[in-house]
């Protein structure tokens, strides 16, 4: 029976790299995969997943109105899909998470999601909360703080390098805007503004 997986971490842990490698492993064996990413995440171009180390792939996009189950079911009816991959899973809606669960349960296709657990304020993303609750398997991807401890938190910085403590939960940005910290250094950074 297929499973729904949630691979989570903070920024710059290699989530997209791992997704692209796993998808390649299927494709190398002649199996078809589908990769999805958020439509508004255009850091690598719309409909593209890219890693910091230079790997990239085209991807289908999702937005609030996308029915992931219907889309995957239709594509699977045309040609078998061996695995579904979702990058930036923290940008899914809660109903998307249940659609992904249905892909695993009803279509018997493994679904591998990759995303952030918490935002810059230390709060769970709604989709991450749902994935933590219902995913069959949870996998933490580790990265490190500047002190060498495991990084579990992320801080957002403005264009002047000052820590941001308020604002929209979702704001697309990369290496210069977000920095990963252990909890101790996140608290010190977050409280210093």
UniProtKB/Swiss-Prot annotation:
Single Gene Ontology MF annotation: thymidine kinase activity
EC class: transferase
Keywords (A to Z) from UniProt: ATP-binding, Cytoplasm, DNA synthesis, Kinase, Metal-binding, Nucleotide-binding, Transferase, Zinc
Recorded catalytic activity of this chain's protein: thymidine + ATP = dTMP + ADP + H(+)
Active site: 88 (proton acceptor)
GO process terms (BP): DNA biosynthetic process; thymidine metabolic process
E.C. numbers: 2.7.1.21
Protein residues bound to Zn(2+): 145, 147, 182, 185
Chain sites annotated for binding ATP: 9-16, 87-90
Gene3D superfamilies on file: 3.30.60.20, P-loop containing nucleotide triphosphate hydrolases
Subcellular location: Cytoplasm
GO cellular component: a single term: cytosol
Stretches assigned to coiled coil: none
InterPro entries in UniProt: P-loop_NTPase (IPR027417), Thymidine_kinase (IPR001267)
Family named by the database record: Belongs to the thymidine kinase family.
Quaternary context: Homotetramer.
Protein's name in the database: Thymidine kinase
Taxonomic source organism: Agrobacterium fabrum (strain C58 / ATCC 33970)
